[in-house]
Curated annotation (Swiss-Prot):
Family note: Belongs to the papillomaviridae E6 protein family.
Signal peptide: none
UniProt cross-references to InterPro entries, sorted A to Z: E6, E6_sf
GO molecular function term, any single one: DNA binding
Oligomeric form and interacting partners: Forms homodimers. Interacts with ubiquitin-protein ligase UBE3A/E6-AP; this interaction stimulates UBE3A ubiquitin activity. Interacts with host BAK1.
Locations listed in the record: Host cytoplasm; Host nucleus
Protein name per its UniProtKB record: Protein E6
HAMAP family, per database record: HPV_E6
Keyword Translocase: no
Listed GO CC annotations: host cell cytoplasm; host cell nucleus
Main subcellular location of this protein, as a coarse class: host cell
Gene name, Swiss-Prot/TrEMBL: E6
Renumbered zinc finger spans (unnamed): 43-80, 117-153
Superkingdom, taxonomy of origin: Viruses
């Protein structure tokens, strides 16, 4: 029988006494010496515990854990990440540029511009950014941050 560890208040206190708060699931796992598969991290938005796959996706997307003033830690499940991304585009859309126009708008090279997926919030790597540029596809400025499509969401659409 596998033991599942819920992050108790005592664990948080130990974490804070040691040093800074972990920002990734893997850092939290290492800090607590609990395997990722045994972590129970609630979603900040729906309160559901993330599955093992969602915990791994969270780090793959380069998202950061959410810490409260009371030292509780939360993540964001895949469903809420999609919902949050759509809400932000609907409520805070600012501008669309195509392909390399983003470099003119930002006055820096594409590799230095932080861009997340407009659907799943994954941080785009350089290949994904260049792919969007080479096909002259859109980048959207939302809440002062750039959005585009990652390779996974591009295949689904």
């Amino acid at each position: 029988m596998q033991t599942v560890h819920y992050l108790s208040r005592m664990c948080y206190t130990k974490l804070l006494m040691d040093s800074t708060r972990p920002l990734t699931v893997q850092q939290l796992s290492d800090k607590l010496t609990v395997p990722v598969v045994d972590l129970l991290l609630p979603c900040r938005f729906c309160s559901r515990f993330l599955t093992y796959l969602e915990l791994r996706e969270f780090d793959y997307k380069h998202l950061q854990l959410i810490w409260t003033e009371e030292d509780f830690v939360f993540a964001c499940c895949s469903g809420c990440a999609y919902a949050s991304a759509q809400f932000e585009i609907q409520q805070f859309y600012q501008l669309t540029v195509y392909g390399r126009e983003i470099e003119q708008e930002e006055q820096r090279p594409i590799g230095q511009i932080c861009i997340r997926c407009q659907y799943c919030l994954k941080s785009l790597d350089l290949i994904e950014k260049l792919d969007i540029c080479s096909f002259n596809q859109p980048f959207h400025k939302v809440r002062n941050h750039w959005k585009g499509r990652c390779r996974h969401c591009k295949e689904i659409e």
